[in-house]
Amino acid sequence: MNDFGIKNMDQVAPVANSYRGTLKRQPAFDTFDGSLFAVFPSLNEEQTLQEVPTGLDSISHDSANCELPLLTPCSKAVMSQALKATFSGFKKEQRRLGIPKNPWLWSEQQVCQWLLWATNEFSLVNVNLQRFGMNGQMLCNLGKERFLELAPDFVGDILWEHLEQMIKENQEKTEDQYEENSHLTSVPHWINSNTLGFGTEQAPYGMQTQNYPKGGLLDSMCPASTPSVLSSEQEFQMFPKSRLSSVSVTYCSVSQDFPGSNLNLLTNNSGTPKDHDSPENGADSFESSDSLLQSWNSQSSLLDVQRVPSFESFEDDCSQSLCLNKPTMSFKDYIQERSDPVEQGKPVIPAAVLAGFTGSGPIQLWQFLLELLSDKSCQSFISWTGDGWEFKLADPDEVARRWGKRKNKPKMNYEKLSRGLRYYYDKNIIHKTSGKRYVYRFVCDLQNLLGFTPEELHAILGVQPDTED
C-alpha cells in the first residue's frame, strides 16, 4: 500500500508519483512519462487529482426539499411533469389578466402578457417582445422552427412546449364538452331522432356531411348548453325529405383573427331557420357586425366590451367571449318585463342588471359609470352635465375608490381608472370632452340600448344643465 492507500497499482495510470490518484487506466497514458505534466503548476500532496466526476457531486444536498422532481436527461415524463408544475403558475396570471385559455383567441397584447410572464418566471434578459408582435392565431401558426428563431436562446423549446400544452388542454376540454352535449337531448326541441343524426354514420338521403375543425371558434365562444345553437363540433348530416326544401344552413361572418369555420343554425318552432348573430371576442375584437348592430349606432357596440385590459387588470374573471344575442328590447322594457321596478333611492340603471341584459358577463366600467350616474345619491361626485350624454367626475378619486371596491381592487386610483376610460376612446364608447377637465361623453347609441332619451333620464334624476365653463 502506497501513501494514498491504493493496494492495486494496476488500477492507475503510470504517471509520476506526485500525480497518482484513482483515475482509471487509459492506454494513451502508457506512452507518456511525467514530463508531460511539467507545464502544470505543482500540486501539494494533499491536492492530488480529483476522481473522475460522476455528476452526482453537482446535485444540491437540499434537492430533496425542491418542489419539482429531480430532472434527468433520459426521463421525458419527469421533465414534462416539472414543466407542467411550472406552467401552472400562468393559469393564475390568466385569471388575473383575463387571458383566454385558448391561445388561438389571444390578442397581440395577451401574447405580450404571456411573454412577460415567461420573462419573469425564467429570469430572462434582453427579450425582444417586438419580435412577437402578433395575435394568438399567428403565434400558433408559426410552427416550431420559426418560433424558435424568434424566441430567446435556451428557452424557446420550453415556451413552445407551454404553448402546445395550452392548445392541447383546450382541445381536450372541447372534446369532453362535445361528448357530453352530443346527445339528442341537447339539440333544439323541434329536432328528434328521425330528423338529425350525429357522428360518422352515412346519411341515408345523400346529404354530404361536412367536418368542422375541432377546438374551433364556437366551443370557446358559445356555451355548449345553449339549446338553440348547434356546436361546430357536431357533424350535420341529414333532414327528412319533407324539410330539405325549406331548410338552409347559414354561416356567420367571422373575423379573420380566428381559426376554423363557424356554423350557427337557429330555427323557430316551425322548423324554418332564422338568422343568428356572430359573437365577438371581447376586448380582442371590437369590429362591429352589421347583423348584430342593425338597431344600434353603426359606430360602436357596448355588447362588444368584455373588459378593459391593462397590466393592472380591472377584471379578475376570465373574459372568455360570450355568445351574445342582439337585444330585441330596450333596457327600460327589459326592467318592466321583469316586473322589477326601480326602488326609491336606488339607481335607475343597476350595473348588475345591465350586465345581464347585455350579456357582457362581469360588470364593466361603462356599466358601473351608468349606475353611478343614475343614482341621485352619487351626484356629489359624478353627474350628468345636462348636455346630452355628457357627464363630469366632480370627485374622480371617489369614483375610482368605488370602482376599486366593486371590483375588489383596493389600490385602484383615478390614474388607473382613466387608463380604462382611454381604452374606450378608440372603440367609440366614451370620449373625453376637449377643454373640460374630468368631463366625458358617451358617444355610443345609449338611447336605443337604455330606452331613455338623455332628457328623460335627466328629468327622472332632477339634473339641471351645468352652466360652469
Curated annotation (Swiss-Prot):
Gene Ontology BP annotations: cell differentiation; ectodermal cell fate commitment; mesoderm development; negative regulation of transcription by RNA polymerase II; positive regulation of transcription by RNA polymerase II; primitive streak formation; regulation of transcription by RNA polymerase II; skeletal system development
Protein's UniProt name: Protein C-ets-2
Sequence segments annotated as region (Disordered): 264-289
Processing and modification events after translation: Phosphorylation by CDK10 at Ser-220 and Ser-225 creates a phosphodegron that targets ETS2 for proteasomal degradation.
Keyword Phosphoprotein attributed: yes
Modified sites of kind Phosphoserine: S220, S225, S295, S298, S301
Gene3D superfamilies per record: Transcription Factor, Ets-1 (1.10.150.50), Winged helix-like DNA-binding domain superfamily/Winged helix DNA-binding domain (1.10.10.10)
Compartments (UniProt record): Nucleus
A cellular component annotation (GO) from this entry: nucleus
Protein purpose: Transcription factor activating transcription. Binds specifically the DNA GGAA/T core motif (Ets-binding site or EBS) in gene promoters and stimulates transcription.
PNT domain span: 85-170
Keywords, comma-separated and alphabetical: DNA-binding, Nucleus, Phosphoprotein, Proto-oncogene, Transcription, Transcription regulation
DNA-binding positions: 363-443
Signal peptide feature range: none
Family, per entry: Belongs to the ETS family.
Pfam family, one: Ets1_N_flank
GO molecular function, one term: protein domain specific binding
Species the sequence originates in: Homo sapiens
Annotated InterPro entries: Ets1_N_flank (IPR045688), Ets_dom (IPR000418), ETS_fam (IPR046328), Pointed_dom (IPR003118), SAM/pointed_sf (IPR013761), Transform_prot_C-ets (IPR016311), Transform_prot_C-ets-2 (IPR027276), WH-like_DNA-bd_sf (IPR036388)
Lineage of source species: Eukaryota, Metazoa, Chordata, Craniata, Vertebrata
